[in-house]
Regions:
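Conserved binding/catalytic microenvironments
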Residues: 1-245
Length: 245
């Protein structure tokens, strides 16, 4: 029990490093966390560390390593016992494969994630797994579609996310609204993307807001600026967004 707690504490520090966009520091924490999780022989704690390993590798754009971590997740004993853990492992795998531009494998993994998610029940699980609900499933699916260049499917998934996201999760709603704006911009729906981007910014609880949301809005703005559109609404949003991006 003590070794598991140590692993969880170190994993929490790693998660904070990932949020701070310091994947190198996160990896240092995760190497230690993996050691303690292994010594504890707790398969759930080990799975949790590998989930963070995937995120840290993805943040460094080391997608081959991220896929290797996802393979460990989906083949773990807890994934064999519980379809929800299997689904998350397949979903992480799909995202990594999509970023490696391996579309057939990515879509197969996404389908596996969908099948496993449909089999999952409401049994008691570790608290951290509570994030992986239907709204998050659709959000992560949208990232697969976006990485494969299918921004229409990404937009569809994000609309599903925003329709089912729990009340009170304002930061998540802001983030996924920003991703919706980005998918719209990449389809050439510039005026709509501007309106959606403005909505995302309005959801942020403070001017500093969320770095992930700000980064996504910055990517949206870049797409819109690059388009060269001279539409009045687009020009207005470019000027306005420059003050808070």
């Amino acid at each position: 029990m003590l070794l598991r707690l140590v692993a969880e504490v170190i994993s929490t520090a790693a998660a904070a490093s990932i949020d701070a966009r310091a994947p190198g520091r996160a990896r240092m924490h995760l190497d230690r966390a993996l050691t303690f999780a292994g010594l504890s022989r707790d398969v759930e704690a080990t799975y949790h560390v590998w989930n963070h390993m995937f995120l840290a590798a993805s943040q460094q754009e080391n997608h081959a390593e991220a896929v290797a971590g996802a393979e460990v997740m989906k083949r773990s004993s807890i994934a064999r016992r519980d379809p929800l853990y299997a689904s998350l492992g397949h979903m992480r795998n799909a995202n990594g494969l999509a970023r490696l531009q391996r579309p057939s494998e990515a879509l197969r993994a996404l389908k596996d994630a969908e099948r496993a998610f449909a089999r999952a029940d409401d049994q008691e699980r570790a608290e951290w797994m509570g994030f992986y609900d239907s709204s998050e499933f659709d959000a992560l699916s949208s990232f697969v579609w976006a990485a494969l260049g299918n921004h229409g499917r990404a937009e569809y998934s994000l609309h599903r996310t925003l329709a089912s996201i729990p009340d009170g999760m304002t930061r998540n709603r802001a983030l996924y609204t920003a991703h919706l704006a980005l998918s719209q911009a990449k389809q050439g729906e510039l005026e709509l993307a501007c309106a959606t981007g403005r909505q995302a910014f309005g959801l942020l609880p403070s001017p500093s807001g969320s770095q992930r949301t700000a980064n996504t809005l910055a990517a949206t703005r870049k797409v819109i600026v690059t388009s060269g559109s001279r539409a009045a609404e687009v020009a207005e949003w470019i000027e306005e967004s420059g003050q808070w991006i």
